[in-house]
Amino acid sequence: MADIVLINPRFEMSYWGLEHALPLVGKKCNLPTACLPLLAALTPVGHRVSIVDENVEPIDYDRVSRADVVGLTGMTVQRGRMREILRELKARGVFTVVGGPWVSVQEDYFDGLADVIFVGEAETTWPRFLDEWTRGAHRRRYEQTEQTDMTRVPVPRYDLLKVKEYLFGSIQFSRGCPFQCEFCDI
């Protein structure tokens, strides 16, 4: 089966990053959102998954280049770094997939850089992609249109993170807002 590496790109310096306070307590950053540990938990048995959080450790491009699939996620503040990473991986001939909040609102930002794009949540599309990829029949774009049933979401694979490096973590018990007010963008 596949060797999969999931990457959380480093954040740019920001007010929210706590860069000045973290060294005082011996930590490197806050725990990223659970999306990559959740993707790891959604990955069918038989695939090997590892997670690289660039906010904690540098990307070993030689190691990552040997993976069958490399996935990136990111928010608006990570978009520039996401492009840098994708360019490097593309130059090395690596098969890449990209998803997350920024891709979901600006998917053409990564045109020509990623082999596959995920829009929206990925609880149903990630396993579907892996099945299709294994059979050599994957698509270029996946979009999950249905809401995720949070009662069926597996426990994220936090064991794949260096949890002692983080100041604090987060848990997820719901997503967004259940209302669909037309004036709101949540």
Short names for language-model regions:
Residues A2-I186:
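Acidic, low-complexity intrinsically disordered segments
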